[in-house]
Amino acid sequence: VHLTADEKAAVTALWGKVNVDEVGGEALGRLLVVYPWTQRFFDSFGDLSSPDAVMGNPKVKAHGKKVLNSFSDGLKNLDNLKGTFAKLSELHCDKLHVDPENFKLLGNVLVCVLAHHFGKEFTPQVQAAYQKVVAGVANALAHKYH
């Protein structure tokens, strides 16, 4: 991912304020609600029968936190996203058979959640930088599919 120094600074500054537990659960939950076909990958999570059930599901929240912790690792290695996400790409491709389009969907949902949480602080410039990052992460996660 090519980010300018200003974009990297903006991404890093905002990410330092992110509550990974809260934002991770909300982002994954919203993905499962807005794109219900993604729920098929989470059969073991229990009740996903309604938006309230999804958003209150502790397994969704826990996995969302795990996802954002991995995303945090990516932010520390923006110049080597493919290397950073190689094992996760392999897992999601070979074992879980996740449609790589879902990575893009989750990235876009994450951007929406960040905008919701940070309001005016999430300027168009910050959003543009985050869109580059989530696209790069989605591409890295889809790498083993190519």
From Swiss-Prot:
One of its GO terms (molecular function) is hemoglobin alpha binding. Disulfide bonds: none annotated. The keyword Calcium does not apply. Keywords: Acetylation, Heme, Iron, Metal-binding, Oxygen transport, Phosphoprotein, S-nitrosylation, Transport. InterPro entries: Globin, Globin-like_sf, Globin/Proto, Hemoglobin_b, Hemoglobin_oxygen_transport. The modification Phosphothreonine is found at T12. It holds the Pfam family Globin. Red blood cells. GO terms for cellular component: blood microparticle; haptoglobin-hemoglobin complex; hemoglobin complex. GO terms for biological process: hydrogen peroxide catabolic process. The modification N-acetylvaline is found at V1. SUPFAM superfamilies: Globin-like (SSF46458). Residues 2-146 form the Globin domain. The keyword Secreted does not apply. PANTHER family: HEMOGLOBIN FAMILY MEMBER, HEMOGLOBIN SUBUNIT BETA. Belongs to the globin family. This is Hemoglobin subunit beta.
